[in-house]
């Protein structure tokens, strides 16, 4: 790698997305990535191409921004090097958007403005935006608590089965835990 392309990939998280990004950087540039995360997840546990550094509650503020400020001052401070931040998950993407102005002074990364991120990451306002700009999107029905009576939907679906059931807010969904929890559920019929 030439001096002109000297950079350090800093990946946020420790899941399969992080491993995939680290592999891409390693294959393209021959460099090892650094990752910061709250927990050590299996996909990166024994990897030789990414060094995972754990910080308790790193996925939450104020720990995230306080840690990034400290890293900027104490670790990632070589003026000859570029520091590339990559959010490998919705929660970290939200944190980068929230702190975009401050972090962009020292790190390189892509992030929406926070208000736009919030608008587009919530399925209700996302589909409203699609309608506003006449953008196509899959047939959708937003189900609210008052539409469910005795555990059953009180109206007919506007489309046939199978259907995908997803949370309206993928970032908030990360903090909800129960047996059988998934990113999306495929429902084949009414029973």
Residue ranges and their predicted role:
Residues 79, 98, 106, 117, ...:
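Glycine-rich phosphate-binding/catalytic subdomain of phosphoryl-transfer
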Residues 111-121:
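A short, structured active-site edge motif that brings together acidic residues
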Residues 56-60, 118, 185:
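Pocket-edge positions in alpha/beta enzyme catalytic cores
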Residues 119-191:
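Active-site nucleotide/adenylate-binding loops and adjacent lid/helix of ATP-dependent enzymes
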Residues 1-112, 146-150:
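ATP-binding N-terminal substructure of ATP-dependent carboxylate-amine bond-forming enzymes
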């Amino acid at each position: 790698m030439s001096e002109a392309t000297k950079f350090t990939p800093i990946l946020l998280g420790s899941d399969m997305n992080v491993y995939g990004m680290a592999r891409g950087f390693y294959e393209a540039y021959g460099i090892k990535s650094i990752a910061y995360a709250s927990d050590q997840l299996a996909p990166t546990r024994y990897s030789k191409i990414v060094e995972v550094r754990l910080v308790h509650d790193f996925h939450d503020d104020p720990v995230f921004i306080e840690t990034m400020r400290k890293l900027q001052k104490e670790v990632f401070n070589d003026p000859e090097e570029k520091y590339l931040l990559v959010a490998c998950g919705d929660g970290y993407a939200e944190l980068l958007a929230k702190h975009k102005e401050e972090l962009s002074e020292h790190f390189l990364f892509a992030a929406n403005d926070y208000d736009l991120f919030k608008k587009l990451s919530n399925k209700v306002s996302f589909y409203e935006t699609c309608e506003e700009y006449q953008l196509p999107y899959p047939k959708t029905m937003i189900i609210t608590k008052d539409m469910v009576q005795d555990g059953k939907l009180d109206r007919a679906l506007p489309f046939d089965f199978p259907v995908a059931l997803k949370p309206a807010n993928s970032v908030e969904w990360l903090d909800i835990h129960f047996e059988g929890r998934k990113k999306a559920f495929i429902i084949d019929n009414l029973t």
